[in-house]
Amino acid sequence: MALLRLLAIRALTMGLVLVTVLFLLVVILGATGYSDLILRNIVREEIRFIRQGMAETIRDPAELERVIERLRQEREIFYGLDKPWYTRLPEMIVRVLTLDLGEARTLQTTRGSPRISEIILERLPNTILLFTTAWLVYILIGIPLGVYLSTRVGGRIDRALSVFSSVSYAVPTWWLALFMIMIFAISLRILPSGGMYSSPPPEGGMARFLDLAYHTILPVITLVLAAVGPVIYNTRTLTLTTAQEDHVTYARAKGLAERAVMGRHILRVAAPPIVTGLLLGLTGTIAGGILTETVFNWRGMGRLYWDALRGTPDEAVIIGLTFIYTLIYVLARFILEVLYLVLDPRVRY
């Protein structure tokens, strides 16, 4: 019961964070006039469809314009555009929460739909696929290497990987992406420079999957090289620090095998901060993936954010993406809280 109560409290806290961010976002939209702009665009879309239907029945252009103008005024009243923006706060919160933000100005889905909700939901799985794959790879590489280096402090491999970790942390991901494209796509020509599929994309499930995997190799390698260094360094440092604590010395004095000491007394204690860095690193990588996806022409949320910002900004798309990124962060924090309760029983009391 105590565990369930703590989970409920954590979930409520994360929910309040999400609602607070939503409220602040909607207040900013209203104060800057963007909420009015979004609603007027929705009215404009509805009137456009109405005009297309009524043009077949009302032949007199003047009469058609009078009817359209009356309907436009009715729709503006319906959406509350005749009232101050702060009276529409609850409605706008629901709209952002459900991504009911109308149509994008120039952006579309692959099927040609301009609906913002459909555009974002089409791009979301692509971003999750790319960054989650890279995340799993650098976890499988970084944690074992970090643990290994903590037992070989000062050796050649330790010094070499420490230098690599510093370089990996310092090099911008977008610069590394351009460098990898120059080597593997332009010079060696063994990997595609970008995109998710060949042009034209192959037909069939397995052929399409293999083509997607082929196009994923270079961006995943780039993300792994950019992120695995800090994972190795943090794991090594946390493991090494924990190994010097008194309870580890006592466990060794009792004659426990080194493997048992490492598993029960070192990694178990070092796991919570390591997991924290990994989960928050994933959310930070996704949120900072705008330039990475743009360089590799990967049709994810980062590339969508870039397309919405350049040229004539598409405010509604930017708002929807901001909410999705916030939602991802809140979900990651909740998962982190759950893992903390599992990995560190002391947090439960």
Predicted regions and their residues:
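Alpha-helical transmembrane segments of integral membrane proteins
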Residues: 3-4, 124-125, 129, 133-157, ...
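Residue-level signal for discrete positions within transmembrane alpha-helices
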Residues: 14, 123, 127, 163-166, ...
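A short amphipathic helical element positioned immediately N-terminal to and/or at the very start
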Residues: 3-10, 89-101, 259, 263, ...
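Short hydrophobic, aromatic-rich alpha-helical segments embedded in or entering the lipid bilayer
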Residues: 63-98, 296-308
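An internal, D/E-rich "acidic patch" concept
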Residues: 76-143
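Membrane-water interface segments at the C-terminal ends of transmembrane alpha-helices
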Residues: 25-33, 164-194, 222-224, 228
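Hydrophobic alpha-helical transmembrane segments of membrane transport/permease proteins
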Residues: 18-86, 190-209
